């Protein structure tokens, strides 16, 4: 893309909008930032960009500025916003921050780092951080980026060089990323979430499935969640790209799984019909709850797709420590264990959390986001106390 003099509207300030506006301005684009909010924080961000020569319009994110040739949006902006409807009517393309990062790869002459991408309703952050830990254990220069930690755009255009990136992608980000082509990608699971944003479960799943499009080496799916394998079947991938499953049971050919407390690989071995490679022990996973073992298997599959040796998988999992609020052990008092899993913000994540324990007093709250809870409560009824 020749950015010089190109009129670009960036929709939204914040962790994605500010880096996008800065990167585009540095490449000669004529950037206008629009933002719905107008508060102290956004005014400070606006002042920072205006000092560079970027036009910022606060309190009005609905109107498409004249002469706009491209819109780059923050991932949370819904597709039915008036700004995007006006862009569609005018024939103006809309990209997300991930699409922009993908398009800017290598534009400084450096060899772009391949992306190992992870999406799913739950487990994305943990899996990406596990993957980054494994890649580091293999001696690779990497970072956990995307919807986590370091901005993906900053990782792509910044001075630090990487061998590979572990990329967390939300359904919002994938919706606006039509050109993304990962080295390998995983969809961990699919359950109703963000239906207020996507409009339907079908639209939500379709956006998740975009992560497989154009994959070159492996599409990793959850054997226990057939909807993820369906997305692999529907994807248009490069010749030779393989479907790789992960399961908490004994793996079949082209799968990773668990046998007698050992994480094993029957996908990336010389004879997957007769051989299995030991990767790590279940006890190497922290915490060793079933859903977290599944996360570890998905991370291992992506790492193995990138050529990482088994010892690095083991060492990376041993080095990994989970973030706060993810089945976090808080205290033991009067023979009761207190656990913080407040990152479980939908029914699927909550179901996985409750399944990790036999007897539970469950304290819950938050927004439903279009979901219902009857099946969750019925399924967990035997475990619930109090």
Annotate each language-model stretch with its function.
Residues 22, 47, 85, 133, ...:
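Alpha-helical segments flanking ligand/cofactor-binding loops in enzyme cores
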Residues 32, 143, 361:
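Conserved beta-strand positions in the Rossmann-like core of class I SAM-dependent methyltransferases
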């Amino acid at each position: 893309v020749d950015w010089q003099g190109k009129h670009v509207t960036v929709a939204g300030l914040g962790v994605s909008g500010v880096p996008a506006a800065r990167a585009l301005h540095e490449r000669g684009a004529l950037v206008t930032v629009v933002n719905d909010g107008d508060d102290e924080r956004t005014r400070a961000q606006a002042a920072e960009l205006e000092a560079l020569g970027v036009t910022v319009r606060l309190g009005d994110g609905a109107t498409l500025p004249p002469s706009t040739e491209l819109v780059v949006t923050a991932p949370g902006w819904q597709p039915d916003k008036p700004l995007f409807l006006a862009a569609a009517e005018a024939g103006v393309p809309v990209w997300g921050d991930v699409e922009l990062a993908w398009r800017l790869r290598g534009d400084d002459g450096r060899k772009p780092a391949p992306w190992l991408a992870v999406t799913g309703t739950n487990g994305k952050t943990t899996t990406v951080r596990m993957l980054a830990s494994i890649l580091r254990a293999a001696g690779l220069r990497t970072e956990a980026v995307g919807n986590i930690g370091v901005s993906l755009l900053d990782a792509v255009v910044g001075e630090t060089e990487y061998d590979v990136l572990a990329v967390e992608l939300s359904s919002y980000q994938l919706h606006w990323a039509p050109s993304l082509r990962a080295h390998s990608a995983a969809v961990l699971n699919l359950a109703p979430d963000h239906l207020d944003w996507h409009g339907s479960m079908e639209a939500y799943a379709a956006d998740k499935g975009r992560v497989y499009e154009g994959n070159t080496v492996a599409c990793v799916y959850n054997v226990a969640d057939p909807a993820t394998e369906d997305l692999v079947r529907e994807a248009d991938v490069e010749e030779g790209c393989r479907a790789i499953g992960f399961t908490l049971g004994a793996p079949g050919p082209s799968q990773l799984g668990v046998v007698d407390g050992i994480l094993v690989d029957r996908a990336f071995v010389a004879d997957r019909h007769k051989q299995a490679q030991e990767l790590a022990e279940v006890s190497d996973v922290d915490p060793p709850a079933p859903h977290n073992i599944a996360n570890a298997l998905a991370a291992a599959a992506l790492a193995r797709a990138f050529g990482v040796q088994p010892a690095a998988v083991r060492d990376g999992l041993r080095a990994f420590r989970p973030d706060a609020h993810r089945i976090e052990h808080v205290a033991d008092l009067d023979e009761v264990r207190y656990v913080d899993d407040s990152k479980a913000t939908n029914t699927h994540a909550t179901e996985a959390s409750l399944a990790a324990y036999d007897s539970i007093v469950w304290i819950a709250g938050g927004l439903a986001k279009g979901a219902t809870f009857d099946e969750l409560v019925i399924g967990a009824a035997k475990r619930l106390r109090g």
